Amino acid sequence: MRHKEQSYNTAQIVLHWTIAALIVFNYFISDEMGRAFRQHLEDSNNGYSFTASIHVYVGLAIIALVVVRVIVRFMSKKTKIVSKHLFERAAHIIHECLYLLMFLVPVFGATAWYFGIHFMGDVHEIAINTMMSLVLLHAFAALFHQYILKDGTLLKMFGQK
């Protein structure tokens, strides 16, 4: 299995790691959000703890950065040979799902928070757990490529190949 795409440009690399760091950060500070959201639903002036506010604003930043990332991705798109290899097709599908979830997860959260829709909070939670599962799969695949296949895939996202 060969990785056909050339190296990523600086904007793609910076956006990748910035968004990844923000997602991981928000995931780990989200414990308080359930309580804050319930308080917020009861009284829209309540639930604004420092952590909840940071979580909401980081989520909004993620939406903006994902939009920029998609634009940069399409502007930087290189011609790729469509692979018939099962793992390469699966990787493509997982990448597309990650892009979709990187956008939708904070949109679901913002919809729940700003419009007071409890159901969207539940959707947000399910979607983030799904996305984090795909992120782990993505990370393991990158490590597999780097250390088992030794094809330099991981180095590309560090701008080294």
Question: Predicted segment positions?
Answer:
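Membrane-embedded alpha-helical bundles that constitute the cytochrome b-like, heme-associated redox core
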Residues: 1-161
